[in-house]
A protein has these predicted regions:
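Bacterial N-terminal signal peptides
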Residues: 9-20
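VWA/integrin I-like adhesion module and closely mimicked acidic/polar interface patches used
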Residues: 72, 158-199
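Short beta-strand-loop
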Residues: 75-115, 192-199
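Exposed acidic/Ser/Thr-rich ligand/metal-binding surfaces
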Residues: 120, 124-176, 226, 230, ...
């Protein structure tokens, strides 16, 4: 246990140094978006092939929803940017879909197609929400565009069981001006919503959306995306 905690502390220290050295440089870029959104979803041992597919198809369908397409065009810049991260253990995170600027139905359909065809790239492992947040924050530290708001959207069905303490990772990321939201998939841990609310989310307007199970994920992610996009464009 002591060795694991030492490793977790070292991982957090490395991540903080990386974030400190990567201040956003996006103001120099030509493209500005209303929100830069990292969709980070769980590929740990508890997520089987069917459950992975329900997450993938649920996110893809959401970006075809007319209400979401209208919302993402409603801000001052008329566009948002999205990237998709798959994660499991503290050393397993990967960008499954790179940054994609979405400014209307054509770009939204292209993103939906990319997500809908996205293979499972992250191998199963333990559940390190903290490492996933730190990794996602690194993607937001120096994106190829300027963003009025930066958000990490974490979907999971479990609690943090590897890597840095979740509250420490959350606090470090929020201190960089990043909002962390959660989607609790309540098929295994019945108190997950409260756990994420107390330990993971943070930043202006942070919230947790709940899916009753993986079959309910599509409904929940649609509501969650609307809640994230509309405040940014309002």
């Amino acid at each position: 246990m002591r060795r694991l905690r030492t490793h977790a502390a070292a991982l957090l220290s490395v991540a903080l140094l990386a974030l400190a050295g990567r201040a956003p440089h996006a103001e120099a870029q030509d493209t500005r978006v209303d929100i830069a959104l990292v969709l980070a979803f769980d590929c740990s041992y508890s997520v089987d092939a069917r459950e992975y597919d329900l997450q993938r198809r649920g996110i893809a369908r959401a970006f075809l929803d007319p209400e979401i397409v209208t919302a993402l065009q409603a801000g001052p810049n008329g566009r948002i940017a999205v990237t998709v991260v798959q994660w499991s253990a503290d050393d397993i995170q990967t960008v499954a879909v790179p940054w994609h600027v979405v400014d209307g139905p054509v770009a939204a359909a292209e993103l939906a197609d990319r997500i809908g065809r996205m293979p499972r790239l992250a191998p199963p492992g333990s559940t390190s929400i903290s490492a996933a947040i730190l990794y996602s924050a690194g993607l937001l530290a120096s994106p190829p565009f300027a963003a009025d708001k930066r958000v990490i959207d974490v979907a999971t069905d479990g609690i943090n069981n590897l890597g840095p303490w979740l509250k420490d990772a959350r606090d470090a990321v929020v201190a960089r001006g990043i909002t962390v939201n959660g989607l609790a998939i309540q098929d295994e841990v019945d108190y997950l919503h409260h756990y994420l609310r107390n330990r993971m989310i943070g930043g202006p307007g942070a919230f947790v959306e709940t899916a009753n199970d993986y079959d309910d994920f599509g409904r929940a992610i649609r509501i969650k995306l609307l809640r994230e996009i509309l405040p940014a464009v309002g």
